[in-house]
Amino acid sequence: MDRNREARRVPMAAAGNGLSRRRHRAGSFRDSPEEEGPVELPEAARLRDRGGSNKKDRDRERDRDRERERERDRERDRLNSRSKRRRGERLMMVHGNLDDGGDDSSEESVNDDEEYDDGGVGPPSSLKMLPPTSNNISAASFSSSLSNHHNGGSGNLHHHHHSHNNNHQRKNNFPPTKVFRSSPSPAPVSPLVSTWKAADEMIGVSVPRKARSACTKRPHESWASSTTGGGVFASGEQIHRQISSTSPANRVSPASILASPSPPAPTSPSSSSISVRKKLPSGTKQKPLPPKSSSSKLSSPVAVQDEIEIEIAEVLYGMMRMPSTSKQEAAGNDLTEAAKSTVEVKSRVSSPISNPQTLPQSSITLAANSSSSNVSAIAPKRKKPRHVKYEDDNSSRVTTIKSEAEAPSKSQVPFSNQLKSSGSGEGNSSVLDSIIPLTRESNASLDSEKKENNLSKDETILPKVESSSGFRSDGEGAKSSSPEKEKFEIDLMAPPPVRSSSERGGEMMECVAAEAKPKVTEVETEAKPLLKEDRSDPAIHDSQEKKRPRMVAEAEHHKFERNCELKLDLDKSDHVGLVNKHHVQKPPPQQQLSVPDKTAQASHLPLHMSMPGWPGGLPTMGYMAPTQGVVPTDTSSLSAAAMQPPPHLLFNQPRPKRCATHCYIARNIQSHQQFTKMNPFWPAAAGSAPMYGTKACNLSLMPPTELQGSVLGRSSNPVQDKNSQSTSKSSETAQRNQLMLQQALPPGAANSILHGPTFIFPLGQQPHAAATIAAASVRPPNSGITSSGPTATSTSMNGSASATPAGAPTMSFSYPAMPGNETQYLAILQNNGYPFPVPAHVGAQPAYRGAPGQPMPFFNGSFYSSQMIQPPHHQPQKQHQQQLTGQMLQSHAPNNQNGSASTGSSAAQKHLQNQQLRPPINHGNSQGFPTHKVQSQPLNFQQRQQPRENATQHSETVGEDSPSTADSRGSRSNVAYGQNYGMQMQPTNLGLMSSPAPGGGVVGSSSSHGEKKSQQQVSKAGVESFQSPGYAMTFATFNGANTAPTLNMSSIAQNHAMFHSMPEAARQGYQMMAAQAAQQKMNYGASLEDGKSGSIGGAATANNTPEEQRKSGGGAIGKTSGGNGGQSIAFSNKQDLADASVSAVTSGSIVDSSSRLLNLGSALPQSSGSLPTSHHQQLLQQQQQQHMQRSQSQQPYTTMYLQKQQRYATSVAASAARTKGPVVSNGSGFPDHNMTTSPAGTTKFANANSGFPQNLVQSSSNQVQSQQWKNNSPRTTNTTQAQSPSMLSPSTSVAAASSLRNIPHKQQSRPQQSQISFAANSKPMTSGSPMQQVQGGTNHQAPSPPMLVGSPSTSSVSKNASGSPRTTASASSAANKGGQASTTTHSASQPSKNLQPASAASSAGGRNNGPSVLGNPTTSSGSKSQQQQQLPKHGLQPQAQLFFSNPYMQAQHQHQQQQITISPSGGYYIQRHQQQSGSAPAVPVTGAVTATSDPAKAIAAASAANNMKGGGGMGKTQQHQLGPPGFTNVHAVSSAVQVKPVDQKQQAGE
C-alpha cells in the first residue's frame, strides 16, 4: 500500500513531470529508461533489486502487493475511478496525489496542499486537489510506509514499487506527460524532464551524472522516505532501504527528491514548483498541473515547466551540493537531502502544487532522512559536493527554503508525529489557503503562517529553538533572524564541531536561509510549506534517527565531510548544533527538534558529549537542552548518540528512533550507561552511599550537568534526559514542569538522579520529593545493595537497579519527606533499560533510608508512583516498611534490588528484552512493580498509565521504548503525567515499594490507610491495606491524595518487587513482617479468609483476607497475602497490564510475594483477590485475563500463553468468581486477595497492579515469576500457589500474564509459560473442575504436568505446555481450593514457613512425590500449606510441587530443602530462587538466592527476594530449563496438587 501510495504520490507529484522523470530516471537507473507500464513491473523489480535491495521475488511480491495495494488504495481511496485513470492516464497521477494526499492529508495533505497552493495559484485548485489526495495517501501511506520502512526495506520498496506501478500507469499516461515534457520543452522542461527521465538523456541544465545519480538516489531516498508515508518513519530504515531501494526513486528522476514526496511528480512538479512559484502569477503551469497532473501540468506549463525543470535541475544539483551539505549539517545526510529537496522542492513546490506535495514530502523525507540519512550518509555525501557546488547558485533560495523547511521540519519533528496537522496542517492549511489565492500572497502568508507555525512548533517542540526558532519565528524576518542566528549559533556552537552534524543542518539551514533570504520570498514561502511537512516528518525522522544511530554516526562523519565542504555552514552548523544542543536545553521547542536532528546527526557529537559526559560529557547533557521532560525526540536523538558512545550496556538502545518515551528511556538508559561507565557508581551502587558521592559524583558529575540542564541537555539521551528531567524536575522542578526538570535539579539530586532513576523525574510532586527522589535515586540503600548483587547483573543488564537505586536514593535523599523515595521518579529509570541498574544502588545507601533503598529499587515505575504517591505516607511507611523491609530488604538489598535486582534481574533480562518488552513488559512489568527500572517506570507509567499501559507501552517502553515510552512520557509527564498514568497503579506500586518497603507492610499499610498505618507498622499489614488504597492511592498518590494507598501500592510494588522479590529473606522477614501485619491484619482478616473475599474491593478486606489467610496459612503468608491483596493492586499494576486481576494479584502477590515472592508472582496475579479472591480472584483473574489478554496482545508470547491461560483462568476465575466470588484461592491468598483487590482495586488497578506483579511477575516472572510462577505455578501454585492456584490462577494468570509479559519480554519463555499455563490453568481448572482438576491433578500427580495439562485445566494447560496448563488448571483448582484453602494453602505457603516443617514434611511426603529435593521445598511449602489445608490437595501438591520441584530440582535442589524451610513462599521462592541461583536468570538473585538458598531459611527473606529475583531469573531458567514442558510439568504438578485442594476448596468456594 505504501508503495502504491508512494507510486501514487509519485504519479500525482510526478504525474506531469515526475512521471517522465521518474520513468526516465528509472530508466536511467534501470537499463531501459523508458520501460512502459508493462515493463514497469520488471522495472520495478529491477528497481527493487537495485534500490530496495529487494530481490526479484520481492519485486514480484511487491508487484503483487503493489497491485493489491493499488487496488486497495483504489478501493480505499475515494478515487477509485481515479486510480484507474491514474493507471490509465495522468489522472492516475492526480489520483495518486489525491489518494496519497488522502492518506497523507493529515500529515502531508496540509503541507502538500499548502505547497501545492504555494506552488501555483491556478494549479493549486486542481493540483491542490491532488496534493490533498496525495497527502491523504501520504498519511495512510505514511503510516504504512513508516511501518513498512520500519519493517524493513519492503515498505519502502513497496512504495517504490507502487510508485513504479504508478509509474507504469503513469507511463502509460506518460506519453502525454513525456510529450508534455518533451513537447512543451521550452528548453528548461525538456532538459529537466530529460534529466528526470534519464539522467543522461537530456538536461537543459547539465546535471553531472554524479548529481543525477545522487539526485536520483539521494532524492530517491528522500523521495522514498517521503513517499513512504512521508518517509518520516521510513527514514531510518528507509534511508538504508532508500539507499538500496533508492533505485526506484533514483530511477524516477534525478530530482527524485522533488519527486520523492510524490514520487515521480515531485521532480517535475518540483521544477515546475520552482518556476511556478516564481511564476506563480502565471497560472499556466499551475493550471496545467492540476488538470490531469500530468497533462495539464506538463502541457500548460510545459515551457514553464521545462524551464522550471531546468531550474530545478540546477537547484537540485546545487542543492544536492550545497543544501545537501547544509542539510548534512542540519540533518546529516538526510538533512542534506532534505535541504536539497527542501530547497529545490520548495522552489519547485512554489510552482506546482504537485511538486509541493511531492517536494514537501521529499523535503520532509530529507529532513526525516536527515535522521535516516545518517544511515544513508553516503548518499547525502555524494549529494554534498553537488550541494556545495550549487551552493552559490541556489544558495540563497535553496538555503532559505532549506533553512525554513528544515527549521520547521525540526520544529515539527515532535509534531510531525502528530502529523503535520498541528503545525503543518495548521500552517499549511493557512498557507495553503493563502497560497491558493496568490503565490506571492501565499508566500508571504505562508511565511508568516509558517513563522507562526514554526514558532509554535518550535516553542512546542523544542526543535531548534535557537537554530530554527530565530529565523522561523521571524518567518519573513526569519531570513534576518537566520543570519543572526547563524552567527549566534556559530558562536554558541563553536565548541563542538561534532554537534555540527546535528546542528549543522539547522545551522546550515539558517545559513542557507540567510543566504537564501535575498533569494526569493516565494521560495521561502514554499520552503515553509515544505518545512511544515518537514516538520511533520521530523518526528518521524526522529524515530528513524533513533532507528539508525549507527548510521547516524556514519552519517555524521559523512556530514562532517560535507561540513568540510560547507565550511561556513559547517561551522555554523557546529555552532548551531551546539547551540541547538545547548539551546535545546534552553528552548524546549527548539531543543526537541534539534535533538532529534542530532540523534541522527549528532551521533558523534552526542558521542563526544556522551562520552565525556558519561561522566562528563554531559555537554551532551547541556546540549540536552531538551531535557524537557518530554522532548523525547530530543532525548532520543541525543540519547542514541550519547548512548552510543558508551554504548555501554545497551544503549544504543536508546535508539532515538522511538517515541518520546522511548527516547527518554533511551536517555535514561544512556545515563545509566554513563553511570555504568562511570562504574564508580556502580560500586557505589553497591556501596550505596558512595553512590551518592561516588556515583553522585560520577553521576552527579555528569548528572549535574546532565541531570540539570545537562542531563536535561542530555535530553538527547532520552534516558538521561528523562533522568535529568526527573531529577531536575523532581528536585527542583518537580513541581515546575517536571518536564523541564532539567537544569534546576539540585546538584545532588541531579547527581543522584542521574543515573538512578534515570529519568527520574520523580514525579515526586514535591520539589522536595523530587530532590529526595534525586537523592534517593542516587543512592537508594537497597539500590546500593541491590546494586551490588543485581546491580551488576541488573546493572549491566537492566537499569533495574538503576531504577531501584533511584527510588532508594530518593528515599535516602528523601528527607524531604518524600518518602521521597518516591522520587521514585519514576525514576524511571526506567531503568529498565538501563543496563545498569543505576540503581539500586545508586542511591544505594540502604542506610540512608533504611528501607528506602528498596523503593528506589523499584525504582521506577514506582517512582513516579511513589513519588506520586506522596511521600508523606510513603515515607513513613516506606521508612517503616523500609525499616522492616529495610532490614530484610537491605539484607536483601541486592535482593531488594532484586526487587530491583530481581526487578533488575528481571529488568536486566527484561531490560534486555525489555526494550521491546518494555512496552509489554513495561506494561506488564512496568505496570506492576517495575521489574526493572524500566519496568518500574513503565510500571509506574504503565501502572499509572495502566490505562495507558497499552499505549505506553510504553512505555515506554520504553521503552520500550521504553518506551517506552509512555514511560518516558509518563515519566516525563512527570508527576502528573507520567506518574499519573503510571501512577494509577504505580503509586500503589510506589507506595508499595515505598510504603511497604517490606512489601506487604506498606502495602497493607496503604491498603487500609488507617489499618495501614497501624499495620504499616505491622510492617505489612500495610500490605493489605495498601492493596486497595494502593490502588486508590495510586491515583490519589499521584494526585497526592492518597498517599498512603499509593504509598502502599508503591511500596508493595516496590517492595513487592524489591522487597518481596528482593528478599527472600526479606520475604521471610517480610513474611514475618507480613506475619505481623498479617496477624495484625489477621485481626481484620482473620475472618476474612474466604469470606473476606467479598471484601476484595476493600483493602482491609483484602488485607483481612490475606491476614486471615496469613493467619491460617501462616501469619506471614496470610498477611502477605492480605497485604498483598492490597498490594495486589499495586502489583496488579504490572499484571494489570495483563489483567485487572493481575492487578490485585500482582499487588497482593507482590506484597505477599515478598513473603512469598512466589505468591507475589503467583499470588500476585492470582492473589489479587487473595482471600476474597477465590471468587474475586477469579474475577480478578478474569480481569486479569482480560488484562492479560490485553497484555497478551502486548506480549505476544506470553500473551499467548497468558491468553490461553487467561482464558482458562478467566473461565476459572469466572466460575470461581461466580462460585466463590472473591473467595480467592487463599492459597495464594493474597494473590487471590490481590485478585480481590484487583477487582476492586485491581480492576482499577488491574493495570497498575499488573504493573507490579508484572514487576513482581517480572521480577517474579523474571525472578519470581518464573520461579514464582514457574515455581509458583508449580511450587507456589503448589504450595502457595496451590492455594494460590486460585491466586495463581489469577495470579498466575496475571502473574503469568505478568510473568508472561515479563517473561516474554524478559524470559518470555520460561516463566511465562509456566506461569501462564499455570495461571491459565488454574483458572480453567478452578473454573472447570477443580475437582476434576484435582482429580486430574491428583491423578496426574505424577504425570501431572502432562496430565494436568490433560486435566480440565488442560485446555489451558495444554496450551501452555502440557504440564503447565494442566498444572495451571490444577493449580487453578488448587488455587481456588487453595484460594479457599488458599488461605491455608496460601497460609500454608506463606506459613509454609510455619507449615514449613509440615510443608517440608508435606513436601517431602506430598511433594516428595516429585523430586523431593527439588519438589520438596516447593512442594513442602506449597504442599505444606496445601497439605495443611488439604491433604488431598497436598497430595496433588506434591505433584505440582514435584513438577515444580522438577524445574526447581533441576535448577536447584538445594533450595528445595531450604525452600521447604522457606516455606511455600520462601520455599517456593527460595526454590525458585535457588533455581534461579542455579540458573543464570537469578543473577541478581543468584547471590542472594544462593546465599539465601542455602541458608534458605535464614535467607528466606533474601531467598524470597532472590527467589523473586532469582526465582524470576531462575524461573526463567527453570522455565527455560524445564522449558514449557519442564515448566509445564512444574506447573502441572502444581496445578495438580493444587487442583485437589482447589477442587475441594474451590468446590466449596465455588
Curated annotation (Swiss-Prot):
Residue segments, region Disordered: 1-191, 207-304, 325-505, 708-736, 779-805, 859-1023, 1086-1130, 1163-1196, 1213-1296, 1321-1435
Gene inactivation effect: Plants have a reduced amplitude and accuracy of circadian rhythms.
Annotated Low complexity bias: 134-151, 292-301, 367-379, 1174-1195, 1254-1273, 1361-1382, 1420-1435
Keyword annotations of the record: Biological rhythms, Nucleus
The keyword Hydrolase is annotated on this UniProt entry: no
Skewed-composition ranges (Acidic residues): 100-118
Compartments where located: Nucleus
InterPro entries reported in the protein's UniProt record: TIC
GO cellular component entries: nucleus
Biased composition (Gly residues): 1112-1126
Residue ranges with Polar residues bias: 241-250, 348-366, 409-432, 713-736, 783-803, 884-992, 1164-1173, 1234-1253, 1274-1296, 1321-1342, 1351-1360, 1383-1397, 1405-1419
Other comments on record: Called 'TIME FOR COFFEE' because it acts in the mid to late night, a phase at which any human activity often requires coffee.
UniProt-listed PANTHER family: PROTEIN TIME FOR COFFEE
Quaternary structure (record): Interacts with MYC2.
Role summary: Regulator of normal clock function. Acts in the mid to late night. Contributes to the amplitude of circadian clocks. May act on the transcriptional induction of LATE ELONGATED HYPOCOTYL (LHY). Inhibits MYC2 protein accumulation, acting as a negative factor in the JA-signaling pathway.
UniProt name for this protein: Protein TIME FOR COFFEE
Species name: Arabidopsis thaliana (Mouse-ear cress)
